[in-house]
Structures are given as structure tokens and as C-alpha cells.
Regions:
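Active-site-proximal alpha-helix that buttresses catalytic centers in soluble enzyme cores
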Residues: 2-3, 7-81, 85, 113, ...
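Active-site-adjacent alpha-helix immediately C-terminal to a catalytic or transition-state-stabilizing loop
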Residues: 60, 73, 88-141
């Protein structure tokens, strides 16, 4: 059994001065939520083996704050393709890690996370709000 946690970045600051969407930072609410979700996973004993984050500032900061808030020892890496990546891209990314890790956390964006969750679980489209998480367990051979 392998598990994937999809973690949408915290609330971002639309009023901040930044170079483009990729560089948009978290706002104070997003910072607080990222830390809270990191602690939540820790209290549930669900700390992933690896965290793979989008390179977008708001996602990368979310991942780092979650990890720091509860002293996760997870491996951390950035993956530019998560930003704007299709559900198929996310599946391929997960597939490349299946022999290395039992659990992983992807930190990224909408609408690709909602689409991926819907496809992976066979459910209708879901609304995946900021700083939200979904865990999916996969049977692998």
C-alpha cells in the first residue's frame, strides 16, 4: 500500500507586489494554515517520506512551513511541472517515486489537484480549497 497526500497551498496574497502568478506569496492566513496542517499531519502520524512541491512561491512556502512547524524529517524536493501540470503528469510523478517511498506529499494547485482526486477516486469533481489535503491510498505491485 502506498499513500499520496495532495496538499493545496495556503491562501495567497493577491495584494502583494510580485513578478507574476508563480511568485505570489502566502498571506498571513495562508502562513498560519500551512503551519497548522503540518502539525495536523504530525498528530495523526501521517508525516510523508517525501514532500514534492511546486516551484511556485506560495506552494514552496506552504511545504516548508508545514515541515518546519512539526519538525518533519521528510525528504524535500521541488518539481516545476506541478505548477500547471495535468492529472496525468501528477500520476507520472507519483509513479516515478513508487519504488523509493511508501508515502509522499505533493504540494500544489488548483484545478489540477481536484481533477486528479476525481480521476483517482472515481468521484465527481470536488472543490479543493486552499490549505486543504486529501490522502489517497494505492495498491501497487
Amino acid at each position: 500500500m502506498k499513500s499520496v497526500i495532495l496538499f493545496r497551498h495556503g491562501k495567497s496574497d493577491w495584494n502583494a507586489s510580485y513578478g507574476g502568478d508563480h511568485d505570489r506569496p502566502l498571506n498571513s492566513r495562508g502562513i498560519k494554515a500551512a503551519k497548522k496542517m503540518g502539525l495536523f499531519l504530525s498528530t495523526k502520524n501521517q508525516i510523508p517520506d517525501i514532500v514534492i512541491s511546486s516551484t511556485a512561491t506560495r506552494a514552496k512556502t506552504t511545504a516548508q512551513l508545514a515541515m518546519e512547524s512539526a519538525n518533519w524529517t521528510s525528504k524535500f524536493m521541488l518539481e516545476s511541472g506541478i505548477y500547471g501540470g495535468s492529472p496525468n503528469y501528477l500520476l507520472e510523478l507519483i509513479h516515478t517515486q513508487k519504488d523509493k517511498y511508501d508515502s509522499l506529499c505533493l504540494v500544489g494547485h488548483e484545478p489540477n489537484f481536484s481533477s486528479f482526486i476525481s480521476i483517482a477516486t472515481g468521484q465527481d469533481y470536488i472543490n479543493f480549497t486552499t490549505a486543504n489535503m486529501a490522502k489517497i491510498n494505492f495498491e501497487v505491485d
